[in-house]
């Protein structure tokens, strides 16, 4: 019989699929999974949404994600919610791109969303890893890509309940 066991271990070598529980000040404790590991960095993505916020306080995607109200909140409030020992190791907070979550196969995405050159993350090839909840309720979440101006000047891509962007 084969069994998959999860154990807590101390390690300096993070691998894709490793998970860690991160206490976020007044937001609660959240599990994050390592999705990409390089010699210089590790990309963790929270398994659940830590908050439910608009991308911008007004209906616009001008400036993209980098100039959004959500990014400003992440760089200030969310960043400070991390434990101090992790803040020293964080090289920037962001949200995934369409490419990282579902790849670049969808014709509609390629035609209507700002492009990215990111490859689909290995764990995201399984639909179950693209689905997330907020406060134990299945919901959708933002992706970094804004819609192109010819389609809409107010929208961003998102990943839906079924794991599709």
Language model features with spans:
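Collagenous Gly-X-Y triple-helix signature in extracellular proteins
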Residues: 1-165
């Amino acid at each position: 019989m084969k069994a998959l066991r999860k154990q807590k271990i101390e390690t300096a070598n993070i691998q894709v699929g490793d998970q860690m529980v991160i206490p976020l000040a007044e937001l609660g404790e959240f599990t994050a999974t390592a999705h990409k590991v390089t010699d210089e960095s590790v990309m963790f993505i929270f398994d659940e949404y830590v908050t439910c916020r608009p991308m911008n306080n007004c209906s616009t995607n001008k400036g993209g994600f980098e100039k959004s109200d959500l990014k400003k909140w992440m760089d200030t409030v969310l960043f400070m919610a991390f434990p101090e020992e992790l803040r020293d190791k964080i090289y920037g907070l962001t949200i995934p791109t369409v490419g990282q979550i579902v790849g670049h196969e969808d014709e509609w995405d390629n035609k209507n969303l700002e492009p990215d050159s990111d490859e689909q993350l290995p764990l995201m090839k399984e639909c179950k890893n693209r689905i997330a909840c907020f406060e134990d309720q299945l919901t959708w979440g933002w992706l970094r890509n804004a819609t192109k101006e010819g389609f809409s000047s107010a929208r961003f891509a998102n990943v839906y309940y079924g794991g599709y962007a």
